[in-house]
Design a protein with these regions (language model features):
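Aromatic- and carboxylate-lined catalytic core of secreted/periplasmic carbohydrate-active enzymes
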Residues: 25, 37-39, 55-193, 206-232
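Substrate-binding/catalytic cleft of secreted carbohydrate-active enzymes
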Residues: 1-64
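Short strand-edge motifs at loop-to-beta-strand transitions and within beta-strands
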Residues: 201-203
């Protein structure tokens, strides 16, 4: 288990999972304390700003980066919830919202969407696959991460800021491909198309910029996987 902590925006916690996954033999690993929603960024630094806090985007970014780099799961935290902030209790680290209300913050809701996405496909088959991303993939806070099922039945690619990326679709072993955009903010799925074509393809997410992260699913259309977040 690793602790990527609360030092800065865009800290690539996937690097910890990537390191652990490369060990032999690979064992389960996860981020036991990623950036907490509503936590002041870098609260342990002398020049900390009480205004600059991690939001739902920060928590989503940490979840997808870690999971697609090989983590076996993920944890979520909220600065107001862990200390059960309520009237009469002294706030720690500038907590400012009652813990009951913080249970319904956007990041908390979106962690459920993360879970539903990965549980809608055989999650344990996923293997990190940076090699399927071609060319100069976006770096820094816009980093793109990808993982592919060991049997080639599906792949999941996360563009942290909606930047375009190019994929080698030959890693998907299928007669016909289905491609889906998944909105990690609201859990909506948008069927891009089904195709018989292979080879390299560049994808441009529907929106871009900080907070405009998108997930692309490329899969074997004949597997009959449900749309992520669809009613069971």
């Amino acid at each position: 288990m690793y602790q990527s902590s609360h030092g800065s925006h865009d800290h690539d916690n996937g690097l910890f999972a990537q390191h652990d996954y490369a060990l032999s033999p690979p064992r389960p690993t996860l981020d036991g304390e990623p950036r907490y929603e509503c936590m002041p960024v870098g609260f342990y630094y002398a020049d900390v700003s009480r205004i600059d806090r991690f939001d739902d985007y920060d928590t989503r970014q940490a979840a997808y980066w870690s999971l697609l780099a090989g983590a076996c799961g993920h944890t979520y935290g909220n600065n107001n919830v862990w200390q059960f902030l309520q009237p009469g209790r002294e706030p720690v680290l500038w907590a400012n919202i009652r813990w009951q209300a913080s249970l319904d913050t956007p990041g908390a809701f979106q962690m459920g969407l993360v879970r539903r996405l990965f549980e809608s496909r055989p999650f344990t088959k996923l293997v990190p696959n940076v090699a399927m991303l071609l060319g100069e993939a976006p770096a820094g806070g816009a980093k793109v991460r990808a993982a592919c099922a060991s049997d080639g039945s599906f792949a999941i690619i996360y563009s942290a800021q909606g930047e375009p990326f190019t994929v080698d679709r030959n890693v998907i072993r299928a007669r016909r491909l289905r491609e889906i955009w998944y909105d990690p903010r609201y859990g909506c799925s948008y069927l891009l198309h089904s195709t018989d074509s292979r080879g390299y393809q560049t994808y441009t997410p529907p929106t871009s910029g900080r907070g405009q992260d998108w997930v692309l699913i490329i899969e074997d259309a004949d597997q009959g996987f449900p749309l992520p977040n669809s009613p069971k």
